């Protein structure tokens, strides 16, 4: 039994040894194959992991041959321009610069681009170059077609909501656009023939207000004429707009058809206490308010002395309203937004209407409404001061038949700066009967683009002012006003304004075609009667 047992044990050991030997060979073969595969993989990955791995993101590397540009140099699809804060770029772990070439369309001179996500996309950057800004902004010559015509007001006009104005976007840099080539203003008013005068005028001046913010005023082709007209207004207002003597009450100035607030500086010159501006153009009123707000007076420390007011800023109070003063009363326009203003600030010392009264002469009712507004707003002795086209000038052009050729066969006069085109055949004697509704289209280069206006027969204006208790004090054309008043005002007006009226002969005033264009206007002053 012992012999059998020993034989069985030897047999079992032999079987185990053979099995162990077979397992060792298989293990060796397996180890050899795995080592070979690992070697191949390492050799492949040494050239490029991207060739065998699809789920690994592309990483810029100085040693890899990249077939696709990294995400941070790609030009993405444009996004909303207010989406300035893109996600942070992934930080590359590679050492050394990438050999990846930028696309030809990509700018290579922006040294900050590698730190900004989607650096090539202009609209995602907080601070953008002038060239990129200009590429995005509409050409001023195309502005009317691109945006203004997209917004319609209640009358079918193209009034722009405040939310679309540049003045409501404090990050908008107007100086950028103003550095470009100057483009003269041209309005874009659709269906003009079907609109009433209010809609046309409102739309025109809305567009004009937006356009002017994109231009440098001194580059205007009529800058000398603008300066001349401003000097005339300084002279008229300076001579006749006065504080009431012997009465302790604020010096108040009512600016009807105030536009963009172009006479705010003149009110500071007059040292008024309270300004009220009303205009039919909502965009112009918004611009006037912003102009006032930006220059509202601040007080400077004098280190122990009495505080001094900044002479370059406005130290009067002001309020602004949008409305048609030719069809509504002043209380109707002001009281809804400024309750109690009539009782607190009226009557006023001066009412001013500059280059606008002629629009009222469409109808007798409009003229009576505006003159009633003026008279009821003024204190006794207060002044009504304005500028209008001269009916005498128009009559002379008609009588002498001093007309220009017109493609439509209509009667037209003027020069390269301005033109007057009559809607109907004018009377041969130049006297319009009846005195209302005598329309012509007026154009002034870079200012008024073929807008309907109405002849203002001055004797009719005088008679209607007398009907509401106002007496004529002055009627004079611009050239005569300037020649008479410039010696007095030469030292009072700013050097910039004076130098802006310098003629080719070294003297000051208007010359050539500008002289005829400014000669189209007169200034007037009426005084409110009573005690």
Curated annotation (Swiss-Prot):
Organism: Scheffersomyces stipitis (strain ATCC 58785 / CBS 6054 / NBRC 10063 / NRRL Y-11545) (Yeast)
Low complexity composition-biased segments: 20-36
PANTHER family: MRNA CAP GUANINE-N7 METHYLTRANSFERASE (PTHR12189:SF2), MRNA GUANINE-7- METHYLTRANSFERASE (PTHR12189)
Catalysis performed (reactions): a 5'-end (5'-triphosphoguanosine)-ribonucleoside in mRNA + S-adenosyl-L-methionine = a 5'-end (N(7)-methyl 5'-triphosphoguanosine)-ribonucleoside in mRNA + S-adenosyl-L-homocysteine
Family statement drawn from the similarity comment of this UniProt entry: Belongs to the class I-like SAM-binding methyltransferase superfamily. mRNA cap 0 methyltransferase family.
Region annotation (Disordered) ranges: 18-165
Protein name listed in UniProt: mRNA cap guanine-N(7) methyltransferase
Pfam short name (any one): mRNA_G-N7_MeTrfase
Positions of mRNA binding: 229-230
Top-level taxonomy: Eukaryota, Fungi, Dikarya, Ascomycota, Saccharomycotina
Site (mRNA cap binding): 260, 266, 291, 358, 453, 521
Keyword field: Methyltransferase, mRNA capping, mRNA processing, Nucleus, RNA-binding, S-adenosyl-L-methionine, Transferase
Molecular function in Gene Ontology: mRNA 5'-cap (guanine-N7-)-methyltransferase activity; RNA binding
Compartments where located: Nucleus
Job of this protein: Responsible for methylating the 5'-cap structure of mRNAs.
Domain mRNA cap 0 methyltransferase span(s) in chain numbering: 220-529
Main location (coarse class): nucleus
């Amino acid at each position: 039994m012992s012999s059998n047992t020993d034989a069985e044990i030897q047999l079992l050991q032999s079987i185990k040894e053979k099995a162990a030997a077979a397992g060792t060979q298989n293990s060796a073969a397996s180890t050899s194959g795995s080592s070979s595969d690992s070697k191949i993989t390492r050799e492949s990955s040494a050239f490029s992991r991207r060739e065998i791995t699809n789920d690994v993101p592309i990483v810029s590397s100085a040693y890899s041959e990249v077939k696709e540009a990294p995400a941070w140099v790609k030009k993405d699809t444009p996004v909303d321009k207010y989406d300035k804060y893109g996600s942070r770029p992934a930080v590359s772990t590679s050492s050394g610069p990438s050999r990846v070439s930028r696309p030809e369309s990509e700018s290579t001179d922006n040294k900050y681009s590698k730190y900004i996500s989607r650096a090539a996309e202009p609209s995602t950057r907080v601070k953008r170059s002038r060239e990129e800004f200009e590429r995005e902004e509409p050409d001023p010559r195309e502005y009317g077609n691109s945006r203004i015509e997209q917004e319609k007001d209640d009358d079918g006009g193209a009034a722009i909501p405040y939310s679309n104005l540049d003045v409501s976007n404090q990050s908008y840099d107007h100086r950028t656009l103003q550095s470009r080539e100057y483009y003269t203003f041209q309005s874009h008013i659709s269906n003009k023939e079907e609109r009433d005068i209010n809609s046309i005028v409102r739309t025109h001046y809305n567009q004009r207000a937006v356009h002017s913010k994109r231009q440098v005023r001194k580059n205007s082709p009529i800058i000398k004429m603008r300066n001349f007209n401003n000097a005339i207004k300084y002279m008229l207002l300076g001579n006749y707009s006065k504080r009431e003597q012997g009465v302790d009450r604020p010096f108040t100035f009512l600016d009807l058809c105030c536009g963009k607030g172009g006479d705010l500086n003149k009110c500071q010159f007059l040292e008024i206490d309270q300004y009220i501006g009303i205009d039919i153009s909502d965009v112009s009123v918004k611009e006037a308010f912003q102009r006032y707000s930006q220059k509202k007076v601040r007080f400077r420390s004098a280190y122990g002395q009495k505080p001094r007011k900044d002479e370059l800023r406005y130290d009067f109070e002001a309020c602004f309203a949008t409305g048609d003063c030719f069809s509504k009363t002043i209380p109707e326009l002001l009281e809804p937004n400024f309750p109690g203003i009539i009782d607190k600030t009226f009557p006023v010392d001066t009412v001013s209407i500059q280059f606008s009264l002629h629009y009222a002469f469409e109808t007798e009712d409009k003229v009576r409404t505006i003159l009633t507004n003026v008279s009821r707003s003024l204190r006794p002795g207060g002044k009504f001061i304005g500028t209008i086209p001269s009916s005498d000038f128009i009559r002379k052009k008609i009588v002498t038949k001093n007309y220009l050729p017109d493609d439509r066969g209509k009667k037209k006069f003027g020069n390269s700066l301005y033109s007057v085109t009559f809607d109907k055949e004018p009377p041969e004697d130049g006297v319009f009967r009846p005195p209302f509704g005598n329309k012509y289209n007026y154009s002034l280069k870079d200012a008024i683009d073929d807008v309907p206006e109405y002849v203002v027969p001055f004797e009719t204006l005088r008679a209607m002012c007398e009907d509401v208790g106002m007496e004529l004090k002055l009627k004079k054309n611009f050239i005569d006003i300037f020649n008479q008043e410039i010696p007095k005002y030469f030292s009072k007006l700013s050097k910039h304004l004076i130098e802006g009226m310098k003629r080719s002969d070294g003297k000051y005033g208007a010359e050539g075609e500008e002289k005829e264009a400014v000669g189209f206007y007169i200034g007037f002053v009426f005084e409110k009667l009573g005690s």
